[in-house]
C-alpha cells in the first residue's frame, strides 16, 4: 500500500512546498482525536436551538462572543455566513457537512424523540461501518441541510 503523500502525487498536482513530504517516511507525530470542527450556518439561533433541543448538545460562548456546541470532549464551533472568523475554510458553505455522532442511547429512543420534535428521518436505521466497528445509524438534516448521522456501536466495547 502506498503512503498517502505518494498517492496524492500521482492523482493531483501537489504544491511544490509539499515535495519534501513525498517520501515513504511518516510524520514525526500522530493525530490523537478531533477536538472541534466548524460549521458555517445561515442562522445561529436556529442552529443552536436544533442542536440543543433535538441532539442534546450544550450551547457555549467563548472568546469574543463566539458560539459553539459542546458534547463529550468535542465541540462544534459555529460561524455565521458572511461573519466567519479568520482563518476559515476556503469555501465556507452552509449545508456542506456530513457528520456522524455516536450515542449510547438506543436508536429506538432517538427515533421517537426525532418524531416528537418533527424532524424527518432521511434513512435508517441502517447498518454502517464506523471508525472502530459496525454501527447502526439514522440520518437526518439540520436547519442548513447538513447530513447528520446518529449512531450506536453494535459492540459495547466501542462506545468511546
Swiss-Prot record:
Task: Return the SUPFAM superfamilies for the record.
Answer: Glyoxalase/Bleomycin resistance protein/Dihydroxybiphenyl dioxygenase
InterPro entries named among the record's database cross-references = Glyas_Bleomycin-R_OHBP_Dase (IPR029068), Glyas_Fos-R_dOase_dom (IPR004360), GlyoxalaseI/FosfomycinResist (IPR050383), VOC (IPR037523)
Q: Which residues form the VOC domain?
A: 33-153
What family does this belong to? Belongs to the glyoxalase I family.
- Entry protein name: Glyoxalase domain-containing protein 5
Organism, scientific name: Xenopus laevis (African clawed frog)
Lineage, broadest ranks: Eukaryota, Metazoa, Chordata, Craniata, Vertebrata
Gene designation: glod5
Amino acid at each position: 500500500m502506498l503512503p498517502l503523500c505518494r498517492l496524492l502525487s500521482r492523482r493531483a498536482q501537489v504544491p511544490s512546498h509539499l515535495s519534501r513530504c513525498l517520501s515513504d517516511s511518516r510524520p514525526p507525530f500522530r493525530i490523537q482525536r478531533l477536538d472541534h470542527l466548524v460549521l458555517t450556518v445561515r442562522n445561529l439561533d436556529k442552529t443552536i436551538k436544533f442542536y440543543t433541543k433535538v441532539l442534546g448538545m450544550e450551547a457555549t460562548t467563548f472568546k469574543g462572543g463566539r458560539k459553539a456546541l459542546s458534547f463529550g470532549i468535542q465541540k462544534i464551533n459555529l460561524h455565521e455566513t458572511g461573519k466567519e472568523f479568520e482563518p476559515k475554510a476556503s469555501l465556507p458553505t452552509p449545508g456542506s457537512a456530513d457528520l456522524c455522532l455516536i450515542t449510547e442511547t438506543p436508536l429506538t429512543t432517538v427515533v421517537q424523540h426525532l418524531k416528537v420534535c418533527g424532524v424527518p428521518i432521511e434513512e435508517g436505521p441502517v447498518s454502517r461501518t464506523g471508525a472502530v466497528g459496525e454501527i447502526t445509524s439514522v440520518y437526518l438534516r439540520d436547519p442548513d441541510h447538513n447530513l447528520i448521522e446518529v449512531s450506536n456501536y453494535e459492540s459495547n466495547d466501542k462506545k468511546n
